[in-house]
Every structure is written in C-alpha cells, then in structure tokens.
Amino acid sequence: MSQQKDRPNDRKAERLVKEAAEAARAEETLIATRKAKAARLRDRGENPFANDVTAGEPLTELAAVRARFDGARAAAEPKAEGAAPDRPAADRYDPASVEPLPFRVAGRVLFVRSFGGVTFVRLRDRTGELQLYCEQGSLAEFERLEDIDLGDFIEARGVAMATQKGELSIRAERLRLLTKAYRPLPTKTSFKDVESRYRMRYVDLVANPHVAGVFRARSAIVAALREFLDARGFLEVETPTMHTLVGGATAKPFKTHHNALDLELFLRIAPELFLKRLVVGGFERVYEIARCYRNEGLSTRHNPEFTMIEYYQAYATYETLMDGTEAMLRHVDARLAERLPAEHAAWVAQRTYSLERFARVPMAEGIARALSKSGLPADVPQRIAADDAPIKEWAKAAKASGREIDWTNFRAGAKKCESPGELVFSAYEYVVEPFLTRDYRTEAGDKSIP
C-alpha cells in the first residue's frame, strides 16, 4: 500500500525534475543566442556594453514625457453593454492634441512586438514606462531591431505622437543599443517565491516594479526624520558599530575578532550606550540613524541586520518624548504624502489606526483591553505561563475578532518569565496593538522608572 502511495509522489518529483532540466536547457539556448547577437554587434564595430549615451540633447525621463502631455489626455470612450474593460481614460491620449515635440529617452526593453513594417517597443526607466513606435520608413536603424531582446537597455530619439488607440508614444527616428542582456527577464509568474524575492531584491524589482515604492518610501522617511530632528536642534552623530561590551538591549549579538588588538568585539545591537555618553559630554540633543545587528530569528518581517533611530534629549521627561514622537510620525506622514502621493493614498486606505493624538495607556491596562477586545479571558498570560492554556480555542476566538497572535512564541516567552512584571511585558509584546505605553515594567528594562 505504501509503495502505491509513493508512486504518484515519485512521478510528480520526476516531472518537476524534468521540467526544471528543460527550463535550464531553454535558458542556456536563449543565453547562447543573445551572446551570438552581441558577437555580431562587435563584428560590426559596435559595443554591446556601451558606457555612454549619444552626445547631444539631454535624456528625458519617461514620466516627464507623459507629464508634458497631460492636457492631451482623452476622455473615456463610452463602452457597449457587456464589453470588456478597455485601457483607463488616464492612459488614453488624443492623437490630434499630442504635439510632435522631439525627445531623447532611454530605458530597459520590456517587450517587442512586430507587425511587418511597424514594431512596438515598450521601455521602462526609473520613473515609468513608455512606448516606442518604430516604423520602417522613419527609423534609420529599423533592421537593427532584430538584435534587440527583452531586458536590453536602449536609447532612442524621435518625436511624440499618439497611436490610433490613444497610446502615447515616441516615433523613433534613431535607436542605439546601450547594454545587451544575456539572461531573460524574470516574470511575476516565474518569480513569486516570497523567500527568493527577499533574498534577491534586485530581481524582484524587475519582476515587480511596484516594490520600488518601498525603497522610495524608506528614503523619504529617513530624510523626513532628519529634517524633523535637525529643525529642533538635535545633532546627528555616528557612534561605534563594534563594541567591547554587549549593551543597550537584551538581544543576542554577533561576535567578531579584532586581529591587531587580539580583542573580542560585538556588533552593536543598539546605539544607546554611546549616545548617552555624548549627552554626559554636553550634547543635550543627539540622535543617530544606526545600522544594528541582532543574532536572532529571521523572517520576511524580522531581519538580523536593520536600521533604527534613537534620540536623546536632556531636561525632558518621557511625556515630552511621547509628544515629540507623535509629532515626528505626523511630520514623516506629511512628507510621504508630498513626495509619494499615489503610494501614500494607498497606504492610508489600508490603515487601521490614526495619527492623531495617541492613546497613552498603562501597560497592564493595555493588555486587559486587548484581551477583552479579542474575546479572550483576562488570565491568558498567567495560564499560558502555567501551561494551562487552550491555545486552539483562544486562537479561534482571536481570529474571529480580527486578531492574529503568535501563540507559539508567546507561550515560549511566557515560560521564561521569572517575575509578574516580566510576564506582563511578555504579554504586552504579543497581545497589544501599538500605542504609547505608561507604567513600563521595571523588570523588563533598565530605562523604566520604579
């Protein structure tokens, strides 16, 4: 019986291995073909890996070309009842309203479609996408299009136009290959494994260009943080990354060795200790946007190498810092709305919280509120620490209320607690939604006030 069960699995494994081998052979063939094209270019005296663009008028970003013709956007055409949805009105342009202005553009080739004497080439640069309209009678290098593959980088010069279907395009008059791509471009369907996407972000950016919004948002956030703190008299500093002592948090550090000094060192888990020393030295307002390292678990939401910000202010209470943190987050949000309006609108639509004045709740009270809201009993922390916990029943109740709780790590952390205060802090980490916390447990941190 077991052998009969194994046979379908064996056949499936064999099929997957065969498909992988066929895909590898197909890719090798494709790479060989592209290398042959590069060789032909060299034979003609052309460099398939140029490090310059043609001298002359400057390159125009593709989004700027679209922006130039905002006034030529066409209204949506009425559709027959039951007709399939067409291109959105925002992407349709009136051919009579698009002036034949000259542009020089460059970007990565996303697709090439040929229809006899006309070839359409879609380009992408860092700002967006645009189509090239390549006509045999207008483009001097029309025959060279045979050497263009998906993923290649090209530059083109021509005039703006709109096709009969309302697609804004550049009617190409000159075209030049800048860089030949040997490997085929990944697609959303061929590159969708979450772990692979996080490990190879550069490939993910090609297959899923919307991911670039995350990078742009991070840049805007860091700039806004600096702007906010600098305007309030804080001094940005850089402190050592390698420490002789482990401090600033309770996380496990990465270890390294200094050969010249024969000294064991630790990559910092937080910049706290040196920032406090600077306050002692007389800098009353300091901050650092620091790269930190914690030798612990990892996931798509938890990276052992990460960036954090810490700021310290003399003559201020923790209530003062709460006010400052609220104002900082609102400032960052406003800057994101200015720099990335489309992405920001989408993020706001997904929010389940407000950036107005935050709730300031004692830690124990916050846990009680969260448990009640999730349909859970008030003694969850005590029972989970005592191994008297109907986890499946609780998980079902929490999920019904819209909450997802990491019960495995919650239970593991609760069992390690040596005092009621530590148990309260552990429960807070896994149960409570983010808000500003008062009455921090002294057992859980040396920065709390007894």
What are these regions (language model features)?
Residues 326-328:
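Short amphipathic alpha-helices in soluble, non-transmembrane regions
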Residues 105, 324, 447-449:
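Residue-level detector of well-ordered alpha-helical segments, enriched
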Residues 217, 266, 317-324, 358, ...:
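Short, contiguous, pocket-lining structural segments
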Residues 2-7, 12, 16-27, 32-320, ...:
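Class II aminoacyl-tRNA synthetase-like tRNA-binding/catalytic domains
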Residues 247-253, 331, 335-450:
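Metal-assisted phosphate- and nucleotidyl-transfer catalytic regions
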